[in-house]
């Protein structure tokens, strides 16, 4: 099982990044392969000039194509997800998320930003033809404390429980996901079916 996780924060230190890292650890503890991409790791020119021929972008596209599911984590700015994340998602082909399960995660300054996932991020994921976009998780800034020195980042207990519940739902959805049939195999099956009638 392969999951691609995408961090939408341009900052090195971000609460959405903390949740993404916790999610990666949880999935890897259950034997899931997780590959993480951060928008800040892509050359700015590749994103701003939509360089589909960039090796970084092509590598990203290939892994998304191979993935069973995605976790997309973003801070919410001015009632929407990060613009840097939008530029990265714009580099995916039209049906890039077909046959994939997606778990959105967002963080914001207050609970007032919670609807940004439903009204801003989910429509973009739907336009990319995500097979199933799960309910997702929203955390306000007071629920995530950054790591300090040797002390790891902390989540309030209610958020920790919501995150684990959502990851469990995501993991189960990945396991029950129907596998798409390769076009060549499908063609062979159709020809065989005609002969057997």
UniProtKB/Swiss-Prot annotation:
GO terms for molecular function: FMN reductase (NADPH) activity; FMN reductase [NAD(P)H] activity; oxidoreductase activity, acting on NAD(P)H, quinone or similar compound as acceptor. Pfam families: FMN_red. Probably forms a two-component reduced flavin mononucleotide-dependent monooxygenase by binding to SsuD. Required for growth on aliphatic sulfonates or methionine but not arylsulfonates. Transmembrane segments: none annotated. It comes from the Bacteria. It comes from Pseudomonas putida (strain ATCC 47054 / DSM 6125 / CFBP 8728 / NCIMB 11950 / KT2440). Keywords: Flavoprotein, FMN, NADP, Oxidoreductase. It is an enzyme of class 1 (oxidoreductase). Signal peptide: none annotated. The keyword NADP applies. GO terms for biological process: alkanesulfonate catabolic process. This is FMN reductase (NADPH). It catalyses: FMNH2 + NADP(+) = FMN + NADPH + 2 H(+). SUPFAM superfamilies: Flavoproteins. InterPro entries: Flavoprotein-like_sf, FMN_Rdtase-like_dom, NAD(P)H-dep_FMN_reductase, NADPH-dep_FMN_reduc_SsuE. The gene is ssuE. Coiled coil: none annotated. Its EC number is 1.5.1.38. Belongs to the SsuE family.
């Amino acid at each position: 099982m392969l999951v691609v996780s995408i961090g939408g924060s341009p900052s090195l230190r971000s609460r959405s990044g903390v949740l993404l890292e916790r999610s990666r650890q949880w999935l890897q503890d259950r034997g899931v392969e997780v590959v993480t991409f951060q928008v800040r790791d892509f050359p700015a020119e590749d994103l701003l000039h939509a360089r589909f021929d960039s090796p970084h972008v092509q590598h990203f596209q290939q892994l998304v194509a191979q993935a069973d599911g995605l976790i997309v984590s973003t801070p919410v700015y001015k009632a929407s997800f990060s613009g840097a994340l939008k530029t990265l998602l714009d580099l995916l082909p039209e049906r890039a998320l077909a046959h994939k399960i997606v778990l959105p995660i967002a963080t914001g300054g207050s609970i007032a930003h919670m609807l940004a996932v439903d009204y801003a991020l989910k429509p973009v994921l739907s336009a990319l033809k995500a097979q199933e976009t799960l309910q997702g998780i929203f955390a306000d800034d007071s629920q995530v404390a950054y790591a300090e020195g040797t002390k790891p980042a902390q989540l309030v207990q209610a958020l920790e429980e919501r995150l684990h519940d959502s990851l469990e739902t995501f993991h189960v959805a990945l396991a029950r996901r129907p596998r798409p049939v390769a076009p060549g195999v499908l063609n062979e099956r159709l020809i065989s079916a005609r002969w057997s009638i």
